[in-house]
Amino acid sequence: MSSIIDVYAREVLDSRGNPTVEVEVYTEAGAMGSAIVPSGASTGVHEAVELRDNDEKRFLGKGVETAVDNVNLEIADELVGWDVFDQVGIDNYLIELDGTENKSRLGANAILGVSLAVAKAAADENGQRLFEYIGGVNGKTLPVPMMNILNGGQHADNNVDIQEFMIMPVGGENFKESLRIGTEVFHNLKNVLKSRKLNTAVGDEGGFAPNLESNEEALQTIVEAIKKAGYEPGKDVMIAIDAAASEFYEDGKYNMAGDNAVRTSDEMIEYYKNLVEKYPIISIEDGLAEDDWDGWKKLTQELGSKIQLVGDDLFVTNVKRLQKGIEMGVCNSILIKLNQIGTLTETLDAIELAKRHGYTAVISHRSGETEDTTIADVAVATNAGQIKTGSTSRTDRICKYNQLLRIEDMLESTAVYDGIKTFYNLSK
């Protein structure tokens, strides 16, 4: 046993210039763990609560001094003397201390910062990397990157309704090679956009947000970039999309302004079936709204054996909502965002539940990120097989990829990279 002797939080900034919480945990043996909490742009209504000060005189109301004070003035005193290796006990106690269903009293940003810093301090105490501490000898699978290279929806100001268009370089023999493939496609995409005199500035997650005319033009442009990079779409590189459909769901219909169309759930399903037939799409995230359970069930029946259907806003990394999805036969994959649920233990529980029922898990960043690389370690530790952490642009995204390169080097010959086999639950 090694006791926690101090817990300290401060207000720092994320990649969008918004305040967030950083927490440090110290042990009696001299170990230290530090974690910075990310923040989302499009958030599901069922997510754990990110506590903001709502004081318009500071950071336009986005300050997090209340969450910081909750760590320094309440949580810290409770954890002093606690065994740093008792991750489950600490996380469960933090949930109990908060006392709400959605962590709205102390704030999920306060609780998660502490939870992750505890894990990092424990790893430091053991002389281990975080992925080794969480995953043990079995944590050795490098994830296929899901790289956001074109943006629409809430992430852009253009005529594209679908929020994210991503590439998945499945053709590499290892993570390092796949990262290179994805990077080369990204640079070729920039050249394609430049040749059309389109904007090549990057957004929050490092993707381009040019003024394209439609969702299909975005897909066509990506296919062109893949080919120009010297790779074969559908073999070396697959496409994934995040529709973020809750953002354009109104009064039971899907209002896709870019397509000048208002669609029902059934019409959205036909729309996706058509896209999957025409383009090398392997994964659709948030294809329907977060509470359109019946629509999701139909979508899964129609496409669930052919492509990955990822629940993000639908599941919000929540075991209860995932269990409902499993029982209804909804989706075949879950997006894992640590700050949606608020503790490391609950995150690992969600991944484990997904795996037990044949669902894949995609470890994900948020729009507001930092230099913190926790998700890279979690992806390897849990053998998730996939990571969504932006394009190969912006240091807040690159740092996760660089951490994965380091981990792959450390694992040497024991490292595993599954490529297309990461979609083990598909029939095609």
Swiss-Prot record:
Residues that bind Mg(2+): 242, 285, 312
Cofactor: Mg(2+)
Annotated pathway: Carbohydrate degradation; glycolysis; pyruvate from D-glyceraldehyde 3-phosphate: step 4/5
Statement: the UniProt record of this protein carries the keyword Protease: no
Active-site residues, record numbering mapped to chain: 205 (proton donor), 337 (proton acceptor)
Subcellular location, record wording: Cytoplasm; Secreted; Cell surface
UniProt-listed SMART domains: Enolase_C, Enolase_N
Any one GO molecular-function label of the UniProt entry: magnesium ion binding
Primary localization: cytoplasm
The protein's Enzyme Commission number: 4.2.1.11
Catalytic activity as recorded in UniProt: (2R)-2-phosphoglycerate = phosphoenolpyruvate + H2O
PROSITE patterns the record matches: ENOLASE (PS00164)
Cofactor note: Binds a second Mg(2+) ion via substrate during catalysis.
Keywords (A to Z) from UniProt: Cytoplasm, Glycolysis, Lyase, Magnesium, Metal-binding, Secreted
GO-annotated biological processes: glycolytic process
Enzyme category, top tier: lyase
GO cellular component terms attached to this protein's record: cell surface; extracellular region; phosphopyruvate hydratase complex
Superkingdom to which the source organism belongs: Bacteria
Gene3D superfamilies according to UniProt: Enolase-like C-terminal domain, Enolase-like, N-terminal domain
Family as reported in the entry's similarity comment: Belongs to the enolase family.
HAMAP family in the cross-refs: Enolase
Function, in words: Catalyzes the reversible conversion of 2-phosphoglycerate (2-PG) into phosphoenolpyruvate (PEP). It is essential for the degradation of carbohydrates via glycolysis.
Protein name: Enolase
Organism: Finegoldia magna (strain ATCC 29328 / DSM 20472 / WAL 2508) (Peptostreptococcus magnus)
Lineage, top ranks: Bacteria, Bacillati, Bacillota, Tissierellia, Tissierellales
